[in-house]
Amino acid sequence: MGKKKSNSSNAAQILESSVSPILEINYNDPLFTAASHPTKPILLSGLATGHVYCNSYDAEKLEELTQSKREEYATLEKQAYTQGKIPHINKSVSQSKKKWWTIVQDNTEIPNDGDLINTNWKTKRHKGSCRHAIFEPLENSVGDFIYTCGTDNIIKKASTETGKVVGKVDVSSDYSNKKDLLTKLCHSVTHPFLLSGTEDGHVLVYDSANLNSNKLKFKVESAHDDSINHILAMPAVSAYHYLTLGSTTLAHIDIRKGIITQSDDQEDELLAMCFPSDEVSQSNDTVLVSHGEGLITIWKNSKNKLMDQLSRVKVNKSASIDTIISTMNADNEDMANSVWCGDSEGLLHRINYKRGRVVETRLHSVAKGKHGAVDEVGILDIDFDYRLVSAGMDTLKIWSNTQDEEQNDEDDDDDNDDSDGDDSESVSGEDSWSDISSSDEELDTNPDDDSDKDDVDVEDDLQLRKKRDDISQLISKPKRKTIDINKLTKATKNTQPEDDEEDQEVPEPSQKKQKVKEKKLTTKQLRNMQKHEHGIRKFEGL
């Protein structure tokens, strides 16, 4: 008998978005890092073997081919349903028996001159594993160079076009502990500052324009007590200011002076962080952090100097949220207020942090992988055309930036019903600065939870909800007729003589009882299935 799926996985499949991948690449060796070029359709992948691959793809052709095959598959499904060969038409991407997107079974077999995807170059870049890879973000040379680090304690700079190494530095001489290892890289958007985090919690800074000098530019000792999980630049504040995550704390550092502030102990591992789309290059005030206990927390530098979280969004209690990234799309209000996150159950969630809820779910992995029960999502990126790129240790997927029109219409209807329900509860519920959760039942049962934490951005959303107050009242009016039924129930159970008069009213309310039917589960109620299971899946061997 197979292992029973968690409630969160079942709910995710029911609430699944109709968006499908356009490309899927499978890896025989564990994939440790991947990056998408900021302005071109180029992918970079680093493996546990130390190999680095650079691939390019034709996004337009992949989109067209995927859409064409999907329409063909949908037509065949409708015909089979009409002929009675299948009980229903399957509209789920993950549960479909046929995949209509382009699939590469082995990344090593991608040709050098392929029509849809090709290999630009490949190389054995590091001895041991390649732990992290990033593209250069400097305005005058954006994407022209790549930086990689490995367990060989070497950071290498190479040309994106050719893969040829143009600079490298051995950082082992700058370690306080010779057994220390590199974990993460980060590059300044405006200056040639290349930051590297270590397992002992230090931050080392080098001049990316002159790596061969092997000269350490700055060093921040013990930014954290444990391994650096993430480094995030703060270009709107200063080229010298960065945020770091390690163990259970968030730190604000100045690479020249050291730690500015370090947060309170969150008693939960902090794994990744990002700014919202509208704050990536401006203000850098709001920070969203993913946790090992399946939630996203919201922080504000202007509120408390990033000393503690202000509010939270519960995403998946049975998994760790291993990675998070901004949608990078500020053209649409919903997307601008959203971030993508990936969890250890292979699920992708789009969180609207101002509404405090999960608004879209995709399934990166639904089957057992080579290196675990499922392909845990540990890598997220956004490609040059705002497509989501998700990856685990087995598979990388590029998702379409278009949605199936027929399914989209149905989703819009569901969202309208769902949003009306949210409006009535939010207006009558707790203050905007209380604990934000994707489960409204959680809000109702814990009205005072985190009541001392607040977030100014949520207030605008509440004002919009109040404008639709009348609609929510109209929807809730029929429920008031159930009061007579409650009296009836009380009268039936109570045997005292003074309730005899109520017993005489039985015929009238018994007719109304027919109107009180058990409704079908709404998308909102299905989403609440996610909160009925506990547990954390920790990293192993990464």
UniProtKB/Swiss-Prot annotation:
GO terms for cellular component: nucleolus. The keyword Repeat applies. The keyword Nucleus applies. GO terms for biological process: positive regulation of transcription by RNA polymerase I; ribosomal large subunit biogenesis; rRNA processing. WD repeats lie at residues 125-170, 177-216, 265-309, 372-409. Residues 403-425, 438-461, 497-506 have a biased composition (Acidic residues). Residues 426-437 have a biased composition (Low complexity). It comes from the Eukaryota. InterPro entries: WD40/YVTN_repeat-like_dom_sf, WD40_repeat_dom_sf. It is found in: Nucleus, Nucleolus. Keywords: Nucleus, Repeat, WD repeat. Residues 400-542 are annotated as: Disordered. Residues 462-471, 530-542 have a biased composition (Basic and acidic residues). Belongs to the WD repeat WDR55 family. This is WD repeat-containing protein JIP5. It comes from Candida albicans (strain SC5314 / ATCC MYA-2876). The gene is JIP5.
